[in-house]
Amino acid sequence: MCLEPISLVVFGSLVFFFGLVKYFKRGERQRTRGILQPEYKDKYYYSKEKGEEMGEVANVNEIPVKIRNHKYPAKEHNLRVKDLLLNRNPKLSKISTAFFIAGEELEGNKYCDTNKDFRQNRYFYHLSGVDIPASAILFNCSTDKLTLFLPNIDEEDVIWSGMPLSLDEAMRVFDIDEALYISDLGKKFKELQDFAIFTTDLDNVHDENIARSLIPSDPNFFYAMDETRAIKDWYEIESIRKACQISDKSHLAVMSALPIELNELQIQAEFEYHATRQGGRSLGYDPICCSGPACGTLHYVKNSEDIKGKHSILIDAGAEWRQYTSDITRCFPTSGKFTAEHREVYETVLDMQNQAMERIKPGAKWDDLHALTHKVLIKHFLSMGIFKKEFSEDEIFKRRASCAFYPHGLGHMLGLDVHDVGGNPNYDDPDPMFRYLRIRRPLKENMVITNEPGCYFNQFLIKEFLEKHPERLEVVDMSVLKRYMYVGGVRIEDDILVTKDGYENLTGITSDPDEIEKIVQKGLKKPRSGFHVIV
């Protein structure tokens, strides 16, 4: 068919136009169809070139729908602290009150021109939502006015780091009433000469006149801040949920990648890599990545042993998202199949967690749930033969023999810190069963906690908790115990939101042992080309 030149131009223009329409529609779908959105959480596409299932590429800037276009609610947090502080100390209602917090500053490494990793003061962040070093906030309880003080512009720093956030930009980004520079602090404090001004500490307060006008370390002020942080608002809950979603996929990646995980450090690397690719710029704590007998160390820090010849892996790792952290632990067999002893221990811990989970609701006493998990452990150990059958469950419980295998608490508060504030622990408790329990209060709605029972076979724990206490050692069949030592330990940890009538498990990665075996086995069948192709 022969077309005139003018017709070719028109035809080409139409093709180009419809091509653009298709392109932008496709782009819109990509923008609204991120892998991290709940409705696409389990969606995958098939790569014909590689002949394998692959996840969609994550959008590192994806923001949860519920908090999209919302500022971090700093004003609301300040108002809650104010109400709790005045209720705690009614005398303050008769005088003018304010609180001031100086944020963390960049700290240099000795003898070089690099800085330590910056981590914002959590109290400061909770009352500001600001992650800028050397900033400060002032909240006037009389006017409910929140003022942010940004560091003065350093021309030399601009040469290397670019222009910092301007005052106008700060007003648009943060939930504040006023933005000033640090150089304006003195003038602002002159307006508050008759105020009682509370602060956390004087560590980053460099003006002596301002320091003299502050009241540091007041227990009522800390109570008000801790209680406010303990009960999460909607924005905080969605932030933790997002952190959990990032960690879910990172744990799945670790379970699926044993062919390229020859050392514990490579387990850590796999988790951090996938967390970073999803926008988790840091972890909430140093990850625990251990194998074999090392799994019996509660907070293992080496992450350096080869995995060859080990039967078990334990990874305790949680990504942060916008300062809020997750905290998830999973265990899996290196062969893709639990050994008989590993499976028994795993199902014991899973039963401990499930029994506690069923009872999580407002008003539940954490002490009672913790004690319950010890009783579940004792029941299983009697069945396994580790505890001698001539002793009753109650007798073993009273002797605290289970503490040799489960020395830590059932869980802790979770939020801006991995071991968040507000749990009211009592580390001086003479009872070994409760000494390390980090929550010693009834649960309340909108608390976020971890549910993380464990079972460990650790020579040091056996020596400290059994051999030094004959009444405990008496109930243990050491010949049976020896068969389980190679397992090291098992801990299963989920992040739980206490709801009005019960709980919501924010953790999505499976803890079902059959499903875990399938995930590991599928990963073991992948060829080398199915993973990172360079190293």
UniProtKB/Swiss-Prot annotation:
EC annotation from Swiss-Prot or TrEMBL: 3.4.-.-
One GO term describing the cellular component: cytoplasm
Chain positions recorded as Mn(2+) 1 binding sites: D327, H412, E452, E493
MF GO annotations: manganese ion binding; metalloaminopeptidase activity; peptidase activity
Keywords: Hydrolase, Isopeptide bond, Manganese, Membrane, Metal-binding, Transmembrane, Transmembrane helix, Ubl conjugation
Protein location: Membrane
Enzyme class, broadest EC rank: hydrolase
Primary location class: membrane
Listed cofactors: Mn(2+)
Residues that span the membrane, as ranges: 8-24
Annotated Mn(2+) 2 binding sites: D316, D327, E493
SMART domains recorded: AMP_N
Glycyl lysine isopeptide (Lys-Gly) (interchain with G-Cter in ubiquitin) cross-link, chain position(s): K50
InterPro entries for the chain: Aminopep_P_N, Creatin/AminoP/Spt16_N, Creatinase/aminopeptidase-like, Pept_M24, Peptidase_M24B_aminopep-P_CS, X-Pro_dipept-like
One GO biological process term: proteolysis
Protein name (database record): Uncharacterized peptidase YFR006W
Family classification: Belongs to the peptidase M24B family.
Protein's membrane topology: Single-pass membrane protein
One Pfam family in the UniProt entry: Peptidase_M24
Cofactor annotation comment: Binds 2 manganese ions per subunit.
